[in-house]
Amino acid sequence: MNIKSVVLCILDGWGNGIENNKYNAISNANPPCWQYISSNYPKCSLSACGADVGLPGGQIGNSEVGHMNIGSGRVVIQSLQRINQEIGTIENNVNLQSFINDLKSKNGVCHIMGLVSDGGVHSHQKHISTLANKISQHGIKVVIHAFLDGRDTLPNSGKKCIQEFTKSIKGNDTRIATVSGRYYAMDRDNRWKRTIEAYEAIAFAKAPCHDNAVSLIENNYQNNITDEFIRPAVIGDYQGIKPEDGVLLANFRADRMIQLASILLGKTDYAKVAKFSSILSMMKYKEDLKIPYIFPPTSFADTLGQTIEDNKLRQLRIAETEKYAHVTFFFNCGKEEPFSGEERILIPSPKVQTYDLQPEMSAFELTEKLVEKIHSQEFALIVVNYANPDMVGHTGNIKAAEKAVLAVDDCLAKVLNAVKKSSNTALIVTADHGNVECMFDEENNTPHTAHTLNKVPFIVSCDNLKLRDGRLSDIAPTILQLLGIKKPNEMTGSSLISCITLCHSS
């Protein structure tokens, strides 16, 4: 095929929706470049959810999961599924035992903090209640710092989740101590004021006080404030973290816990840090945080990035802040350091309260740099992520989502033009999961802010090429076939190319 370079363009949250549905921001926007490539290049559809990406059946996919499946070239059993299978038998876990023994010896309180949600993207409330119950059985007082979702779930599902969670906490000495919307507790874009506001409620009980979590949520709903944006609050007579206490970070996904964990450990410029005795996380978060964890990470051999390195080729990863970790850490399946020959470019995301206020985000700045790198012809593989469809889709604002679609489409046209002008270069356009193609939940009569179960597109800018439907783990083998590189045995995905006659970039 004589392809020397592949540009893998991941349109984050761009799923295959119902055409001409009034809540499909893609079809509403009628993006011209998208219509062109969909009509003129080989295409197929990929499954991006459930068992096809290593999640429980019927579970929506997400960006972490999607990028790991794409980058590894295999179905990766995800943290949610793994913990579901193993959490019932974690009593013998060495790090958990050490954590419990430290609390017992000092008569400390266990502070469990995490997203109390059934969304399954960053955490699951059943994991948190199981941990609370197992720890309280040792005579340890447990307090919960509940983060509310409304982003990977319906915007006003928090009340129901908290009610169910409260019933599931069996320990007599277990209760909810603080409540915070994830907008504050789980920021990942260096909006430190948000993180500090959540931290001060958790560490020092410095926040408005309410009698119980349900009434707090109801009061916010009455003021049109949904789960994600509920300001940190103290519940009852909670007094804060004490030196003899322990902290357990219950989210299994790392990216939205790094800032809070960094403040807890005194690794930021924030001066007033509460002392505590021990800390533990559900999964490994980040090497330099040095937090013990319950479930060790899975190692991956012969990923796409590794294979490109092994063939002594160069690769580029480029994204704006919101998705930078996905094209680097997650795409490389948990490897923090770049591969040899891997260049990384971070484009700062705009500093706005929510991205419906600036739907184009930093897509144009990103594209300018990307086009420059495509023309350089330095790289065998370029991986780029456009965050707009997902980040604006999460706001539930359909008009803004349509603007986001058009902004990305404008960028896509520039990328396609650059690829056409570069010899022996192919463009792949795909997505990691759906979102922006469904902006309203008609059944519940509420904006749809979560991901979808829809398949995602896969388009290759090659003539005379036939594709078959597949799943995200088939993308890496397809890229290797285009580049004429043998697929490693560890890659269990299969190329999506079903037939080649005379393929050339176009």
Curated annotation (Swiss-Prot):
Q: What is its EC number?
A: 5.4.2.12
> Where along this sequence does the record place binding of Mn(2+) 1?
D390, H394, H451
One of the record's GO cellular component terms: cytosol
Pathway(s) it belongs to: Carbohydrate degradation; glycolysis; pyruvate from D-glyceraldehyde 3-phosphate: step 3/5
The reaction(s) catalysed by this protein are:
(2R)-2-phosphoglycerate = (2R)-3-phosphoglycerate
| Keyword tags | Glycolysis, Isomerase, Manganese, Metal-binding
Q: Does the keyword Manganese apply?
A: yes
Q: Give the highest taxon in the source lineage.
A: Bacteria
Q: Which residues are listed for substrate binding in this entry?
A: H122, R151, D152, R182, R188, R253, A254, D255, R256, K323
List the active site.
S63 (phosphoserine intermediate)
Molecular function GO labels: manganese ion binding; phosphoglycerate mutase activity
Q: Could you say which cofactors this protein requires?
A: Mn(2+)
Query: Record's InterPro entries?
Result: Alkaline_phosphatase_core_sf, BPG-indep_PGM_N, Metalloenzyme, PGAM_B_sf, Pgm_bpd_ind
Write out the residues that bind Mn(2+) 2. Answer: D12, S63, D432, H433
State the top-level EC class.
isomerase
Q: Cofactor: bound how, per the entry note? A: Binds 2 manganese ions per subunit.
Any GO BP annotation? glycolytic process
Q: Which family does it belong to?
A: Belongs to the BPG-independent phosphoglycerate mutase family.
Q: What is its biological role?
A: Catalyzes the interconversion of 2-phosphoglycerate and 3-phosphoglycerate.
Assembly, in brief, is: Monomer.
Protein name (database record): 2,3-bisphosphoglycerate-independent phosphoglycerate mutase
Q: Which organism is it from?
A: Wolbachia pipientis wMel
